[in-house]
A protein has these predicted regions:
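Bacterial N-terminal signal peptides
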Residues: 5-14
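N-terminal hydrophobic or amphipathic helices and topogenic motifs
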Residues: 17-39
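Extracytoplasmic substrate-binding proteins
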Residues: 20, 29-30, 96, 100, ...
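Short helix-initiation/N-cap motifs at beta->coil->alpha
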Residues: 24-28, 77-87, 207-216
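A short, structured surface patch at a secondary-structure boundary
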Residues: 38-92, 96-102, 203, 231
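Short secondary-structure boundary segments
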Residues: 44, 101-102, 177, 207, ...
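His/Asp/Glu-enriched short active-site or ligand-binding loop at hydrolase and phosphoryl-transfer sites
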Residues: 64, 188-211, 231, 259
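Short helices/loops that flank or line small-molecule/ion binding pockets
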Residues: 86-93, 115, 214-223
Length: 292
């Protein structure tokens, strides 16, 4: 009986205290907050956007460069960009810091934790993971009603796109991030998940690096039916049309050179479904050109 009581006491000790908030992040680290976060620092543009989507935009006291959506995010104090200003972060006295596992330096995250800050890491690896991120943020910020509703709407829209496009005839796709160096994504990157959602196949899915450099010769050998470019802004990059010199490429011969605004596909946020839908429409157009 004593052994049973001791076991129960140990189990209860491992549970969050009454009112305490417990969440496990993508790294497996357990996050504990005594109360919903009121002062949050975001270390990535996509996290800033997720915070607003989860109803916690008014809790954000600092963020990084390129956090530009929604428009209110542009007004937030900056704490660095690729390199973080740790002093500025500490000065904001956050009760929660939300970081990007693959985008923030490991040493910087470790230093923030050593300084006594609570750091939760985000890394949606598949489109469906965005909904879970919204729910976790809602729990940490105490905005579950808004966050859960946003997650539900996201899952429903994702299911609709999957039902419409994922089983369509396959289309070989080359997704170009940049020109110099010539860069793409592998099969584990979330953009590849969008390609699969649309019934496409990433021709460089097998490469081991998330954002590998490739050669023009490798692209020609892969002979994609569609080339999709992102770039850095909201307008079609001039270098997308550089592919027209390679007239033997199926994508060129059929005029399947497309652009999707990078913020819609390269940020792990609810807007990724806007980008995915644009991509799906492009791939459907490419299917319509077969046999012509």
């Amino acid at each position: 009986m004593k052994r049973l009581c001791l076991s129960l006491l140990c189990a209860l000790a491992c549970l969050p205290a009454r009112g305490e908030i417990g969440v496990t992040d993508v790294s497996g680290a357990g996050i504990r907050l005594a109360a919903p976060a009121r002062r949050i620092v975001s270390l990535s543009p996509h996290i800033t956007e997720l915070l607003f989507a989860a109803g916690a935009g008014d809790r954000v006291v600092g963020t990084v460069d390129y956090s530009d959506y929604p428009p209110a995010a542009k007004l937030l104090p900056r704490v660095g960009g690729h390199s973080l200003d740790l002093e500025a972060i500490v000065a904001l006295k956050p009760d929660l810091v939300l970081g990007w596992q693959s985008g923030n330096a490991v040493a910087a995250v470790a230093r923030l934790r050593a300084l006594g800050l609570t750091v939760h890491l985000s890394e949606p690896k598949r489109i469906e993971d965005v909904a879970g991120e919204l729910e976790r943020i809602g729990k940490l910020a105490g905005t579950e009603a808004t966050a859960n509703a946003a997650a539900k709407a996201f899952r429903e829209r994702y299911a609709q796109l999957a039902a419409r496009y994922s089983r369509r005839p396959s289309v070989a796709v080359f997704y170009q991030i940049w020109k110099q160096p010539l860069m793409t994504v592998n099969g584990k990157q979330i953009i590849s998940d969008a390609i699969r959602l649309c019934g496409g196949r990433n021709v460089f899915a097998q490469l081991p690096i998330l954002a590998p450099t490739v050669t023009v010769e490798a692209v020609i050998a892969a002979n994609p039916e569609v080339i999709v470019a992102s770039g850095m802004g909201e307008s079609r990059p001039e270098w997308l049309d550089d592919w027209r010199r390679w007239t033997t490429l199926t994508a060129v011969a059929r005029d399947n050179l497309y652009f999707v605004p990078p913020d819609l596909l390269q940020r792990h946020t609810p807007r990724i479904l806007d980008g995915a839908e644009k991509l799906c429409i492009h791939l459907e157009a490419a299917r319509g050109k077969r046999g012509k």
